[in-house]
Regions:
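Conserved nucleotide-sugar phosphate-binding/catalytic loop shared by glycosyltransferases and other
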Residues: 8-9, 28-82
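Conserved nucleotide-sugar donor-interacting segment of glycosyltransferase catalytic cores
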Residues: 91-148
Length: 345
Protein backbone atom coordinates (compact mmCIF):
# COMPACT_ATOMS: atom_id res chain seq x y z
CA UNK A 1 0.00 0.00 0.00
CA UNK A 2 0.96 3.65 -0.43
CA UNK A 3 0.84 6.12 2.46
CA UNK A 4 1.63 9.77 2.98
CA UNK A 5 2.78 10.33 6.58
CA UNK A 6 2.39 13.94 7.77
CA UNK A 7 4.36 14.77 10.93
CA UNK A 8 4.30 17.96 13.01
CA UNK A 9 7.87 19.22 13.25
CA UNK A 10 7.95 20.97 16.63
CA UNK A 11 10.11 19.02 19.09
CA UNK A 12 11.22 15.41 18.73
CA UNK A 13 8.16 13.67 20.20
CA UNK A 14 6.03 13.62 17.05
CA UNK A 15 8.99 12.34 15.02
CA UNK A 16 10.00 9.55 17.41
CA UNK A 17 6.40 8.33 17.73
CA UNK A 18 6.03 8.39 13.93
CA UNK A 19 9.36 6.61 13.52
CA UNK A 20 7.97 3.74 15.59
CA UNK A 21 5.04 3.40 13.16
CA UNK A 22 7.21 3.83 10.07
CA UNK A 23 9.36 0.94 11.28
CA UNK A 24 6.23 -1.20 11.63
CA UNK A 25 5.14 -0.30 8.07
CA UNK A 26 8.36 -1.37 6.34
CA UNK A 27 7.64 -2.78 2.89
CA UNK A 28 4.96 -0.21 2.09
CA UNK A 29 5.56 2.79 -0.19
CA UNK A 30 5.64 5.84 2.12
CA UNK A 31 6.18 9.55 1.51
CA UNK A 32 7.01 11.43 4.72
CA UNK A 33 5.99 15.09 4.91
CA UNK A 34 7.60 16.97 7.80
CA UNK A 35 9.53 20.07 8.78
CA UNK A 36 11.54 21.34 11.72
CA UNK A 37 12.90 18.83 14.22
CA UNK A 38 10.97 15.97 12.63
CA UNK A 39 12.62 16.49 9.24
CA UNK A 40 16.06 16.74 10.84
CA UNK A 41 15.56 13.47 12.75
CA UNK A 42 14.04 11.39 9.94
CA UNK A 43 15.83 12.61 6.80
CA UNK A 44 19.20 10.95 7.67
CA UNK A 45 17.39 7.61 8.08
CA UNK A 46 16.72 7.36 4.36
CA UNK A 47 12.98 7.97 4.16
CA UNK A 48 11.42 9.61 1.10
CA UNK A 49 11.00 13.11 2.55
CA UNK A 50 9.12 16.25 1.50
CA UNK A 51 9.81 19.36 3.59
CA UNK A 52 6.81 21.37 4.81
CA UNK A 53 6.39 24.33 7.23
CA UNK A 54 6.19 23.85 11.00
CA UNK A 55 3.94 25.67 13.44
CA UNK A 56 6.03 26.38 16.54
CA UNK A 57 5.90 28.32 19.78
CA UNK A 58 8.27 31.28 20.22
CA UNK A 59 9.67 32.12 23.65
CA UNK A 60 10.28 35.61 24.97
CA UNK A 61 11.83 36.81 28.23
CA UNK A 62 10.03 34.21 30.33
CA UNK A 63 12.00 30.97 30.04
CA UNK A 64 9.14 28.73 31.18
CA UNK A 65 6.36 30.28 29.11
CA UNK A 66 6.04 30.89 25.39
CA UNK A 67 5.11 34.39 24.23
CA UNK A 68 1.54 34.52 22.94
CA UNK A 69 2.30 37.58 20.82
CA UNK A 70 5.59 36.31 19.34
CA UNK A 71 4.08 32.87 18.72
CA UNK A 72 1.04 34.36 16.98
CA UNK A 73 3.26 36.68 14.91
CA UNK A 74 5.36 33.68 13.84
CA UNK A 75 2.44 31.37 13.07
CA UNK A 76 -0.10 33.82 11.60
CA UNK A 77 1.16 33.62 7.98
CA UNK A 78 1.17 29.81 8.14
CA UNK A 79 -2.31 29.62 9.66
CA UNK A 80 -3.52 32.00 6.96
CA UNK A 81 -1.98 29.72 4.33
CA UNK A 82 -3.77 26.68 5.79
CA UNK A 83 -7.20 28.28 6.04
CA UNK A 84 -7.08 30.14 2.69
CA UNK A 85 -5.42 27.23 0.84
CA UNK A 86 -2.43 29.35 -0.02
CA UNK A 87 0.90 28.65 -1.72
CA UNK A 88 2.27 26.07 0.74
CA UNK A 89 -1.10 24.35 0.99
CA UNK A 90 -1.21 24.16 -2.81
CA UNK A 91 2.21 22.59 -3.27
CA UNK A 92 1.61 20.09 -0.42
CA UNK A 93 -1.79 19.11 -1.80
CA UNK A 94 -0.30 18.69 -5.30
CA UNK A 95 2.51 16.46 -4.01
CA UNK A 96 -0.02 14.27 -2.19
CA UNK A 97 -2.24 14.10 -5.27
CA UNK A 98 0.71 13.18 -7.51
CA UNK A 99 1.81 10.44 -5.07
CA UNK A 100 -1.70 8.86 -5.15
CA UNK A 101 -1.67 7.35 -1.64
CA UNK A 102 -4.23 4.85 -0.37
CA UNK A 103 -4.40 6.86 2.87
CA UNK A 104 -2.80 9.78 4.68
CA UNK A 105 -1.47 9.10 8.18
CA UNK A 106 -1.22 12.24 10.27
CA UNK A 107 0.56 13.12 13.52
CA UNK A 108 -0.82 16.55 14.48
CA UNK A 109 0.06 18.02 11.06
CA UNK A 110 -2.54 20.44 9.60
CA UNK A 111 -1.49 20.82 5.94
CA UNK A 112 -1.56 17.09 5.18
CA UNK A 113 -4.74 16.47 7.17
CA UNK A 114 -6.72 19.19 5.44
CA UNK A 115 -5.29 18.24 2.03
CA UNK A 116 -6.42 14.65 2.53
CA UNK A 117 -9.96 15.85 3.31
CA UNK A 118 -9.96 18.10 0.24
CA UNK A 119 -8.71 15.30 -2.04
CA UNK A 120 -11.12 12.71 -0.63
CA UNK A 121 -8.28 10.49 0.61
CA UNK A 122 -8.87 8.48 3.83
CA UNK A 123 -7.25 10.22 6.81
CA UNK A 124 -5.85 8.26 9.78
CA UNK A 125 -4.88 10.35 12.80
CA UNK A 126 -2.11 8.85 14.97
CA UNK A 127 -0.93 11.11 17.78
CA UNK A 128 -1.09 11.82 21.49
CA UNK A 129 -3.57 14.67 21.41
CA UNK A 130 -6.32 12.34 20.23
CA UNK A 131 -6.35 10.92 23.76
CA UNK A 132 -7.17 14.39 25.07
CA UNK A 133 -9.68 15.23 22.31
CA UNK A 134 -11.40 11.86 21.88
CA UNK A 135 -10.77 10.23 25.26
CA UNK A 136 -11.97 10.38 28.84
CA UNK A 137 -9.67 9.98 31.83
CA UNK A 138 -9.40 11.19 35.37
CA UNK A 139 -7.90 14.68 35.54
CA UNK A 140 -8.17 17.80 37.74
CA UNK A 141 -11.09 20.12 37.00
CA UNK A 142 -8.80 23.05 36.14
CA UNK A 143 -7.03 21.04 33.44
CA UNK A 144 -10.31 19.68 32.11
CA UNK A 145 -11.59 23.24 31.68
CA UNK A 146 -8.41 24.30 29.84
CA UNK A 147 -8.65 21.23 27.64
CA UNK A 148 -12.00 22.27 26.17
CA UNK A 149 -10.59 25.24 24.26
CA UNK A 150 -7.45 23.37 23.19
CA UNK A 151 -9.51 20.45 21.90
CA UNK A 152 -11.69 22.70 19.76
CA UNK A 153 -8.60 24.27 18.17
CA UNK A 154 -7.02 20.84 17.58
CA UNK A 155 -10.12 19.45 15.87
CA UNK A 156 -10.59 22.60 13.80
CA UNK A 157 -7.18 22.92 12.22
CA UNK A 158 -6.19 19.25 11.72
CA UNK A 159 -9.05 18.18 9.46
CA UNK A 160 -11.61 15.41 9.95
CA UNK A 161 -10.04 11.95 10.40
CA UNK A 162 -11.79 8.78 9.25
CA UNK A 163 -9.87 6.77 11.85
CA UNK A 164 -8.35 7.99 15.12
CA UNK A 165 -5.55 6.29 17.06
CA UNK A 166 -4.43 8.01 20.25
CA UNK A 167 -1.38 7.08 22.30
CA UNK A 168 -0.58 8.05 25.89
CA UNK A 169 1.36 6.65 28.83
CA UNK A 170 -1.73 6.90 31.06
CA UNK A 171 -5.04 5.01 30.65
CA UNK A 172 -8.05 6.59 28.90
CA UNK A 173 -11.35 5.44 27.38
CA UNK A 174 -12.44 6.48 23.86
CA UNK A 175 -15.46 8.78 23.54
CA UNK A 176 -15.77 8.53 19.74
CA UNK A 177 -16.63 5.45 17.66
CA UNK A 178 -13.74 6.25 15.28
CA UNK A 179 -11.17 6.21 18.08
CA UNK A 180 -8.86 3.55 19.46
CA UNK A 181 -6.67 4.55 22.41
CA UNK A 182 -3.45 2.69 23.22
CA UNK A 183 -0.43 3.01 25.48
CA UNK A 184 3.08 4.22 24.56
CA UNK A 185 4.36 3.74 21.00
CA UNK A 186 8.04 2.79 21.22
CA UNK A 187 10.58 3.02 18.40
CA UNK A 188 12.69 -0.01 17.48
CA UNK A 189 15.96 1.43 18.84
CA UNK A 190 14.41 1.85 22.30
CA UNK A 191 12.65 -1.53 22.21
CA UNK A 192 15.93 -3.28 21.46
CA UNK A 193 18.14 -1.23 23.80
CA UNK A 194 19.95 -2.89 26.70
CA UNK A 195 18.29 -1.45 29.80
CA UNK A 196 20.76 -0.80 32.59
CA UNK A 197 20.69 1.33 35.73
CA UNK A 198 23.79 3.46 35.36
CA UNK A 199 25.20 6.24 37.48
CA UNK A 200 24.38 9.27 35.35
CA UNK A 201 21.36 11.58 35.50
CA UNK A 202 20.01 12.46 32.04
CA UNK A 203 18.77 16.00 31.34
CA UNK A 204 16.75 16.77 28.21
CA UNK A 205 14.47 19.74 27.58
CA UNK A 206 12.52 20.14 24.34
CA UNK A 207 12.75 23.90 24.94
CA UNK A 208 16.44 24.71 25.42
CA UNK A 209 15.48 27.93 27.24
CA UNK A 210 14.75 25.67 30.23
CA UNK A 211 18.46 24.91 30.70
CA UNK A 212 19.12 28.13 32.61
CA UNK A 213 22.40 29.12 34.31
CA UNK A 214 20.65 28.71 37.67
CA UNK A 215 19.67 25.12 36.88
CA UNK A 216 23.11 24.35 35.47
CA UNK A 217 24.65 25.64 38.72
CA UNK A 218 22.42 23.34 40.80
CA UNK A 219 23.36 20.37 38.64
CA UNK A 220 27.07 21.03 39.18
CA UNK A 221 26.47 20.79 42.94
CA UNK A 222 25.22 17.20 42.67
CA UNK A 223 27.41 14.28 43.62
CA UNK A 224 26.41 12.43 40.42
CA UNK A 225 27.44 12.61 36.77
CA UNK A 226 24.98 14.58 34.60
CA UNK A 227 24.55 13.97 30.86
CA UNK A 228 22.74 16.94 29.28
CA UNK A 229 21.38 17.19 25.73
CA UNK A 230 21.55 20.73 24.37
CA UNK A 231 21.47 22.42 20.97
CA UNK A 232 24.71 24.37 21.38
CA UNK A 233 27.46 22.23 22.86
CA UNK A 234 29.67 24.01 25.44
CA UNK A 235 32.74 22.39 26.94
CA UNK A 236 32.14 19.77 29.62
CA UNK A 237 32.71 21.10 33.10
CA UNK A 238 32.52 19.83 36.67
CA UNK A 239 30.19 16.81 36.62
CA UNK A 240 28.25 17.74 33.45
CA UNK A 241 28.87 16.20 30.02
CA UNK A 242 27.05 17.75 27.06
CA UNK A 243 25.64 15.89 24.05
CA UNK A 244 23.92 16.77 20.80
CA UNK A 245 20.48 15.19 20.28
CA UNK A 246 21.21 12.57 17.65
CA UNK A 247 19.10 9.42 17.71
CA UNK A 248 21.75 6.80 18.56
CA UNK A 249 23.43 8.80 21.31
CA UNK A 250 20.14 9.70 22.96
CA UNK A 251 18.91 6.08 23.02
CA UNK A 252 22.22 4.93 24.49
CA UNK A 253 22.13 7.55 27.22
CA UNK A 254 18.46 7.22 28.18
CA UNK A 255 18.60 3.40 28.32
CA UNK A 256 21.60 3.47 30.67
CA UNK A 257 20.76 6.42 32.94
CA UNK A 258 19.53 6.22 36.53
CA UNK A 259 16.72 8.77 36.04
CA UNK A 260 15.65 11.72 33.90
CA UNK A 261 15.01 15.44 34.24
CA UNK A 262 12.91 16.47 31.26
CA UNK A 263 10.08 18.57 29.90
CA UNK A 264 6.65 16.95 29.83
CA UNK A 265 6.40 15.53 26.33
CA UNK A 266 4.17 12.45 26.15
CA UNK A 267 6.46 10.46 23.85
CA UNK A 268 9.59 10.80 25.98
CA UNK A 269 7.60 10.01 29.12
CA UNK A 270 6.31 6.82 27.48
CA UNK A 271 9.83 5.78 26.49
CA UNK A 272 11.10 6.54 29.99
CA UNK A 273 8.44 4.27 31.50
CA UNK A 274 9.27 1.53 28.98
CA UNK A 275 12.91 1.78 30.11
CA UNK A 276 11.85 1.96 33.78
CA UNK A 277 13.36 5.39 34.43
CA UNK A 278 11.95 7.72 37.12
CA UNK A 279 11.23 11.26 35.94
CA UNK A 280 11.57 14.75 37.36
CA UNK A 281 9.31 16.49 34.90
CA UNK A 282 9.09 20.21 34.05
CA UNK A 283 6.09 21.10 31.86
CA UNK A 284 6.02 23.85 29.29
CA UNK A 285 3.11 26.29 29.52
CA UNK A 286 0.71 24.21 27.44
CA UNK A 287 -2.33 22.25 28.57
CA UNK A 288 -0.98 19.01 27.11
CA UNK A 289 2.35 19.20 28.96
CA UNK A 290 0.67 20.21 32.20
CA UNK A 291 -1.59 17.16 31.93
CA UNK A 292 1.37 14.89 31.22
CA UNK A 293 3.29 16.19 34.24
CA UNK A 294 0.24 15.79 36.46
CA UNK A 295 -0.14 12.20 35.25
CA UNK A 296 3.50 11.36 36.04
CA UNK A 297 3.10 12.52 39.63
CA UNK A 298 -0.38 11.02 40.01
CA UNK A 299 0.91 7.62 38.86
CA UNK A 300 3.71 7.83 41.41
CA UNK A 301 6.51 7.34 38.86
CA UNK A 302 8.16 10.72 39.34
CA UNK A 303 7.73 14.32 40.44
CA UNK A 304 6.43 17.37 38.61
CA UNK A 305 8.06 20.73 39.20
CA UNK A 306 8.76 24.14 37.64
CA UNK A 307 11.96 25.99 36.79
CA UNK A 308 12.07 27.95 40.04
CA UNK A 309 11.68 24.85 42.19
CA UNK A 310 14.12 22.89 40.04
CA UNK A 311 16.73 25.60 40.65
CA UNK A 312 16.09 25.65 44.40
CA UNK A 313 18.55 24.22 46.89
CA UNK A 314 18.15 20.49 47.53
CA UNK A 315 15.14 19.72 45.30
CA UNK A 316 16.97 17.52 42.77
CA UNK A 317 18.74 15.73 45.64
CA UNK A 318 15.33 14.96 47.17
CA UNK A 319 14.19 13.47 43.86
CA UNK A 320 17.31 11.30 43.59
CA UNK A 321 16.78 10.01 47.12
CA UNK A 322 13.30 8.78 46.09
CA UNK A 323 14.37 7.11 42.81
CA UNK A 324 13.79 3.55 44.00
CA UNK A 325 10.33 4.47 45.28
CA UNK A 326 9.34 5.81 41.86
CA UNK A 327 11.02 2.98 39.95
CA UNK A 328 9.13 0.34 41.92
CA UNK A 329 5.83 1.64 40.47
CA UNK A 330 6.89 1.70 36.82
CA UNK A 331 6.83 -1.97 35.77
CA UNK A 332 3.04 -2.24 35.12
CA UNK A 333 3.31 0.54 32.51
CA UNK A 334 6.26 -0.92 30.55
CA UNK A 335 4.79 -2.13 27.27
CA UNK A 336 5.14 -1.20 23.59
CA UNK A 337 1.92 -0.62 21.62
CA UNK A 338 3.40 0.10 18.18
CA UNK A 339 2.36 -3.34 16.78
CA UNK A 340 -1.23 -2.61 17.90
CA UNK A 341 -1.18 0.69 16.00
CA UNK A 342 0.20 -0.95 12.84
CA UNK A 343 -2.62 -3.51 12.94
CA UNK A 344 -5.19 -0.71 13.30
CA UNK A 345 -3.74 1.10 10.27
Amino acid sequence: MKFVYGIHGYGRGHATRSLSILQQLEGHDILVMAGGDAYDLLEPLGYDMFRIPTLAYVYGKRKDRFSMWLSFKHMAPMLWDIFTRGKDYGRIKKRISDFKPDAVINDSEPWTGRSANNLGIPLISVDHYAVLSYGDWDMPGKLKKQLGTTTRIYRFYLGKPDRIIGSAFYPAKPTDSRATLVGPIIRKEVREADITEGDHLLVYFNNQHFFTPEIEKRLTELDVEVHAFVQKIPEDHHNIRFFRSDNCTFVREISSCRSIITSAGNQLAGEALFLRKPMLIVPEASTEQQMNSWAVQNMGVGLETDLDQLASDGFVKEFLERENEFRSRITPFSRDYSPDVAREI
